[in-house]
Amino acid sequence: MRKFSTYDLAQISLLACLIIVTGMFKIPTGIPGSEFQLSAPIAVAIAAVFGFKRYFLAGIIASLILFLLGIHSILNVEISIIFRLTVGLIIVLLGTSIPVLVVAGPIGTMVARLGLAFTLGTPFLPLFVLAIPGMVITAVSVYPITKMLYAINKKVAGDHHVRNVL
Protein backbone atom coordinates (compact mmCIF):
# COMPACT_ATOMS: atom_id res chain seq x y z
CA MET A 1 0.00 0.00 0.00
CA ARG A 2 1.47 3.32 -1.03
CA LYS A 3 1.54 6.34 1.23
CA PHE A 4 -0.64 9.35 0.53
CA SER A 5 1.13 12.22 -1.17
CA THR A 6 0.48 15.87 -0.44
CA TYR A 7 -1.57 15.95 -3.63
CA ASP A 8 -3.74 13.06 -2.38
CA LEU A 9 -4.34 14.72 0.99
CA ALA A 10 -5.31 18.01 -0.65
CA GLN A 11 -7.57 16.24 -3.14
CA ILE A 12 -9.36 14.20 -0.46
CA SER A 13 -9.83 17.35 1.64
CA LEU A 14 -11.30 19.24 -1.32
CA LEU A 15 -13.63 16.32 -2.07
CA ALA A 16 -14.77 16.35 1.57
CA CYS A 17 -15.48 20.08 1.26
CA LEU A 18 -17.43 19.46 -1.94
CA ILE A 19 -19.55 16.84 -0.16
CA ILE A 20 -20.15 19.18 2.79
CA VAL A 21 -21.13 22.20 0.70
CA THR A 22 -23.38 20.29 -1.70
CA GLY A 23 -24.99 18.47 1.24
CA MET A 24 -26.21 21.82 2.53
CA PHE A 25 -28.22 22.43 -0.64
CA LYS A 26 -31.60 20.86 0.05
CA ILE A 27 -33.98 21.12 -2.89
CA PRO A 28 -37.71 20.71 -2.14
CA THR A 29 -39.40 18.06 -4.26
CA GLY A 30 -43.01 19.12 -3.80
CA ILE A 31 -43.84 16.34 -1.35
CA PRO A 32 -43.98 17.47 2.31
CA GLY A 33 -41.17 15.87 4.31
CA SER A 34 -39.22 15.01 1.20
CA GLU A 35 -36.21 16.91 -0.05
CA PHE A 36 -33.26 16.24 -2.31
CA GLN A 37 -29.63 16.77 -1.30
CA LEU A 38 -27.27 17.61 -4.12
CA SER A 39 -24.53 15.65 -2.35
CA ALA A 40 -26.03 12.28 -3.39
CA PRO A 41 -25.22 12.44 -7.13
CA ILE A 42 -21.96 14.27 -6.32
CA ALA A 43 -20.97 11.39 -4.02
CA VAL A 44 -21.68 8.78 -6.70
CA ALA A 45 -19.69 10.82 -9.22
CA ILE A 46 -16.77 11.15 -6.79
CA ALA A 47 -16.73 7.37 -6.28
CA ALA A 48 -16.75 6.81 -10.05
CA VAL A 49 -14.08 9.37 -10.92
CA PHE A 50 -11.72 9.27 -7.94
CA GLY A 51 -12.14 5.68 -6.72
CA PHE A 52 -13.55 4.10 -3.60
CA LYS A 53 -10.66 4.90 -1.24
CA ARG A 54 -10.66 8.64 -1.91
CA TYR A 55 -14.48 8.73 -1.97
CA PHE A 56 -14.85 6.91 1.33
CA LEU A 57 -12.13 8.89 3.11
CA ALA A 58 -13.61 12.18 1.88
CA GLY A 59 -17.05 11.04 3.05
CA ILE A 60 -15.79 10.05 6.50
CA ILE A 61 -14.03 13.41 6.86
CA ALA A 62 -17.16 15.27 5.74
CA SER A 63 -19.38 13.34 8.16
CA LEU A 64 -16.94 13.87 11.02
CA ILE A 65 -16.71 17.62 10.40
CA LEU A 66 -20.50 18.00 10.14
CA PHE A 67 -21.00 15.93 13.30
CA LEU A 68 -18.39 17.87 15.29
CA LEU A 69 -19.93 21.17 14.19
CA GLY A 70 -23.34 19.95 15.36
CA ILE A 71 -24.87 20.16 11.90
CA HIS A 72 -25.39 16.39 11.65
CA SER A 73 -26.68 14.02 14.29
CA ILE A 74 -25.48 10.46 14.75
CA LEU A 75 -28.45 9.35 12.61
CA ASN A 76 -27.27 11.56 9.74
CA VAL A 77 -23.81 10.03 10.05
CA GLU A 78 -25.31 6.52 10.05
CA ILE A 79 -27.31 7.23 6.89
CA SER A 80 -24.24 8.74 5.20
CA ILE A 81 -21.96 5.82 6.05
CA ILE A 82 -24.50 3.22 4.89
CA PHE A 83 -25.05 5.17 1.66
CA ARG A 84 -21.31 5.50 1.02
CA LEU A 85 -20.56 1.85 1.69
CA THR A 86 -23.41 0.69 -0.54
CA VAL A 87 -22.56 3.02 -3.43
CA GLY A 88 -18.85 2.24 -3.12
CA LEU A 89 -19.45 -1.51 -3.08
CA ILE A 90 -21.71 -1.32 -6.14
CA ILE A 91 -19.16 0.73 -8.09
CA VAL A 92 -16.19 -1.43 -7.03
CA LEU A 93 -17.99 -4.65 -7.95
CA LEU A 94 -19.86 -3.54 -11.10
CA GLY A 95 -17.68 -0.75 -12.51
CA THR A 96 -18.45 2.78 -13.62
CA SER A 97 -20.71 2.24 -16.61
CA ILE A 98 -23.68 4.56 -17.01
CA PRO A 99 -26.33 2.01 -15.90
CA VAL A 100 -24.33 1.20 -12.76
CA LEU A 101 -23.95 4.88 -11.87
CA VAL A 102 -27.65 5.52 -12.47
CA VAL A 103 -28.77 2.77 -10.07
CA ALA A 104 -25.97 3.09 -7.47
CA GLY A 105 -27.39 6.25 -5.84
CA PRO A 106 -30.99 5.04 -5.56
CA ILE A 107 -29.86 1.64 -4.24
CA GLY A 108 -27.60 3.39 -1.72
CA THR A 109 -30.49 5.57 -0.60
CA MET A 110 -32.80 2.56 -0.29
CA VAL A 111 -30.29 0.61 1.83
CA ALA A 112 -29.62 3.69 3.98
CA ARG A 113 -33.36 4.10 4.58
CA LEU A 114 -33.55 0.41 5.49
CA GLY A 115 -30.78 0.96 8.05
CA LEU A 116 -32.58 4.02 9.42
CA ALA A 117 -35.84 2.07 9.72
CA PHE A 118 -34.01 -0.66 11.63
CA THR A 119 -32.31 1.85 13.95
CA LEU A 120 -35.51 3.79 14.69
CA GLY A 121 -37.76 0.74 14.78
CA THR A 122 -40.12 2.34 12.28
CA PRO A 123 -41.66 0.89 9.12
CA PHE A 124 -39.44 1.02 6.05
CA LEU A 125 -42.13 1.94 3.51
CA PRO A 126 -42.89 5.53 4.66
CA LEU A 127 -39.17 6.33 4.80
CA PHE A 128 -38.67 4.83 1.35
CA VAL A 129 -41.64 6.60 -0.28
CA LEU A 130 -40.41 10.01 0.89
CA ALA A 131 -36.99 9.26 -0.65
CA ILE A 132 -38.30 8.34 -4.13
CA PRO A 133 -38.25 11.88 -5.63
CA GLY A 134 -34.65 12.37 -4.51
CA MET A 135 -33.71 8.95 -5.87
CA VAL A 136 -35.12 9.90 -9.28
CA ILE A 137 -33.26 13.23 -9.30
CA THR A 138 -30.05 11.44 -8.29
CA ALA A 139 -30.44 8.89 -11.07
CA VAL A 140 -31.06 11.59 -13.68
CA SER A 141 -28.28 13.95 -12.60
CA VAL A 142 -25.43 11.56 -11.80
CA TYR A 143 -24.18 11.07 -15.37
CA PRO A 144 -23.72 14.77 -16.26
CA ILE A 145 -22.07 15.41 -12.89
CA THR A 146 -19.74 12.44 -13.41
CA LYS A 147 -18.75 13.71 -16.86
CA MET A 148 -18.07 17.16 -15.42
CA LEU A 149 -15.96 15.83 -12.53
CA TYR A 150 -14.03 13.55 -14.87
CA ALA A 151 -13.24 16.45 -17.22
CA ILE A 152 -12.14 18.68 -14.33
CA ASN A 153 -10.00 15.93 -12.82
CA LYS A 154 -8.37 15.18 -16.16
CA LYS A 155 -7.52 18.86 -16.73
CA VAL A 156 -6.23 19.44 -13.21
CA ALA A 157 -4.47 16.15 -12.48
CA GLY A 158 -3.55 15.01 -15.96
CA ASP A 159 -3.65 11.39 -17.03
CA HIS A 160 -1.39 10.18 -14.23
CA HIS A 161 -3.92 10.52 -11.41
CA VAL A 162 -6.95 9.69 -13.56
CA ARG A 163 -5.69 6.18 -14.29
CA ASN A 164 -4.55 5.39 -10.73
CA VAL A 165 -7.79 5.92 -8.81
CA LEU A 166 -7.67 2.73 -6.77
Curated annotation (Swiss-Prot):
Where is the protein found, in the record's own terms? Answer: Cell membrane
GO aspect biological process, one term: biotin biosynthetic process
Q: Which Gene3D superfamilies match?
A: 1.10.1760.20
Membrane-crossing ranges are 12-32, 33-53, 55-75, 87-107, 117-137
* Topology term for the membrane: Multi-pass membrane protein
Q: What's the protein called, per UniProt?
A: Protein BioX
Q: What function does the entry list?
A: Does not seem to be a permease of pimelate. Its role in biotin synthesis is not clear.
Give the signal sequence positions.
none
Mention any one GO cellular component term assigned to this protein in its UniProt record.
plasma membrane
Q: Which UniProt keywords apply?
A: Biotin biosynthesis, Cell membrane, Membrane, Transmembrane, Transmembrane helix
Q: Which gene encodes it?
A: bioX
